[in-house]
Amino acid sequence: MTLESIMACCLSEEAKEARRINDEIERQLRRDKRDARRELKLLLLGTGESGKSTFIKQMRIIHGSGYSDEDKRGFTKLVYQNIFTAMQAMIRAMDTLKIPYKYEHNKAHAQLVREVDVEKVSAFENPYVDAIKSLWNDPGIQECYDRRREYQLSDSTKYYLNDLDRVADPAYLPTQQDVLRVRVPTTGIIEYPFDLQSVIFRMVDVGGQRSERRKWIHCFENVTSIMFLVALSEYDQVLVESDNENRMEESKALFRTIITYPWFQNSSVILFLNKKDLLEEKIMYSHLVDYFPEYDGPQRDAQAAREFILKMFVDLNPDSDKIIYSHFTCATDTENIRFVFAAVKDTILQLNLKEYNLV
């Protein structure tokens, strides 16, 4: 065998090895691409206090590790702070709305609670417990609570204030429902990934207040689905940032902007009409037609009201080929969210079967 033929033979062995390595790299790249495609990015959008953070907490309960006692203990201080924040908001509103206290001694209680620096609150003890209990039982404060649409008050106010004995117990440990109800405005971006049927769902919650929205822009790449939350109960409320703008009009304007963004041409849109429980309560005394004169349905009818609100949002969609999937929800109700998200998951997977190699 000549030297040339020996070298050619060696070279072809090297070439074969190089090709084998190259093929393996190509295969790995294809695998990586396929695996990357098995991650679905769900962007949670909506105005402030529409229920986005509560929805993420539910995903942790339903599809994640939930909340251990240690995790729940971490919310104790926030529950106390929510109680003080709510009572201070009502005390301020008593002045603004010129509502008198029925019981004279509650003026001193109000002064005591008013002077608390909420951010420094880490305990819930007397004299504050008795002061807040006494205030909550004052008919003046109850009238003020009934007029809450005229100022900003957390949806969880009644939930906590009706349960002060339990929360004031020295051995208090927040329940799962306490955790779901606690209000902490989202600043920045919160991501929650969870695994379902060998697909990673990456849920991204961005702050809803106006100042937070400019931070959204870089979340817009490769979004599988937009999940847009609307608080049904906000039809008669004004914005935190601007007290002459209707919250639902703001939500409609944001939805219109989002669904016409070029980034989202290929993203499915799922509309969650949230806080259906609060709508059912409120519609009995606050009439939709007073805020949306075009409503011509019956008064005190939650079903008619929510269908009207759904139509208002769906009509904002300029693309007749784009389907808007919608669900009525109560984000603090784990079973409701479990049921709704199972349907949403199936919709998303169906829409992405080929794209994500799920068939």
From Swiss-Prot:
Modified residues (Deamidated glutamine): 209
Annotated spans, G1 motif: 41-54
Region annotation (G2 motif) ranges: 178-186
Tissue: Predominantly expressed in ovary, prostate, testis and colon. Down-regulated in the peripheral blood lymphocytes (PBLs) of rheumatoid arthritis patients (at protein level).
Illness the protein is tied to: Capillary malformations, congenital: A form of vascular malformations that are present from birth, tend to grow with the individual, do not regress spontaneously, and show normal rates of endothelial cell turnover. Capillary malformations are distinct from capillary hemangiomas, which are highly proliferative lesions that appear shortly after birth and show rapid growth, slow involution, and endothelial hypercellularity.
G-alpha domain sequence ranges: 38-359
Lipid moiety-binding region (S-palmitoyl cysteine): 9-10
Region (G5 motif) residue spans: 329-334
Protein's gene: GNAQ
Stored Gene3D superfamilies: GI Alpha 1, domain 2-like, P-loop containing nucleotide triphosphate hydrolases
Reactions this protein catalyses: GTP + H2O = GDP + phosphate + H(+)
Family that this chain belongs to: Belongs to the G-alpha family. G(q) subfamily.
Gene Ontology CC terms, in alphabetical order: cytoplasm; extracellular exosome; Golgi apparatus; heterotrimeric G-protein complex; lysosomal membrane; nuclear membrane; photoreceptor outer segment; plasma membrane
Record-linked CDD domains: G-alpha
Localization annotation: Cell membrane; Golgi apparatus; Nucleus; Nucleus membrane
Listed name of the protein: Guanine nucleotide-binding protein G(q) subunit alpha
Annotated membrane topology: Lipid-anchor
